[in-house]
UniProtKB/Swiss-Prot annotation:
UniProt keyword annotation of Zinc present: no
Protein name per its UniProtKB record: Small ribosomal subunit protein bS6
GO cellular component terms, A-Z: cytoplasm; ribonucleoprotein complex; ribosome
The species this protein was found in: Thermoanaerobacter pseudethanolicus (strain ATCC 33223 / 39E) (Clostridium thermohydrosulfuricum)
Known function: Binds together with bS18 to 16S ribosomal RNA.
Gene name in the database record: rpsF
SUPFAM superfamilies referenced in this protein's UniProt entry, alphabetically: Ribosomal protein S6
Amino acid sequence: MRSYETMYILSPDLSEEERKGLIERFKNLIIENGGEITNFDEWGKRKLAYLIDKKPEGYYVLMNFNSDSKVSQELERVYKITDGVLRYLIIRTDE
């Protein structure tokens, strides 16, 4: 298993229920595919450096997890097709 870090920015227009639902969906995707979440941190709503989809703010979430590469690829695929995800980044943090 490898260590990964992902940060994603959710649309500020989402309701609290929608936002929590997306966060749980991403967490469950990792766990159900044999990964484990080692750190989870919601940074909350922050101002963006530049407009993304004409939005000046975004809701930031940071997660560290251990899994094999197929889980990170599936997570990236889900980020791409999910409405409400403005930006995302997944990096491998193996040392």
